[in-house]
Amino acid sequence: KYPLEKFQNIG
C-alpha cells in the first residue's frame, strides 16, 4: 500500500 501503512493503520 504505502510506507505509512503501519502508521495509517490507526484509521
UniProtKB/Swiss-Prot annotation:
Keyword vocabulary terms for this entry = Cytoplasm, Elongation factor, GTP-binding, Nucleotide-binding, Protein biosynthesis
| Any one annotated GO CC term | cytoplasm
Gene Ontology molecular function, alphabetical: GTP binding; translation elongation factor activity
Q: Which domain of life is it from?
A: Bacteria
Q: Where in the cell is it found?
A: Cytoplasm
Does the keyword field hold NAD? no
- Where does the protein principally reside? cytoplasm
Q: What does this protein do?
A: Catalyzes the GTP-dependent ribosomal translocation step during translation elongation. During this step, the ribosome changes from the pre-translocational (PRE) to the post-translocational (POST) state as the newly formed A-site-bound peptidyl-tRNA and P-site-bound deacylated tRNA move to the P and E sites, respectively. Catalyzes the coordinated movement of the two tRNA molecules, the mRNA and conformational changes in the ribosome.
Give the family per the record: Belongs to the GTP-binding elongation factor family. EF-G/EF-2 subfamily.
Its protein name is Elongation factor G
Which species? Clostridium pasteurianum
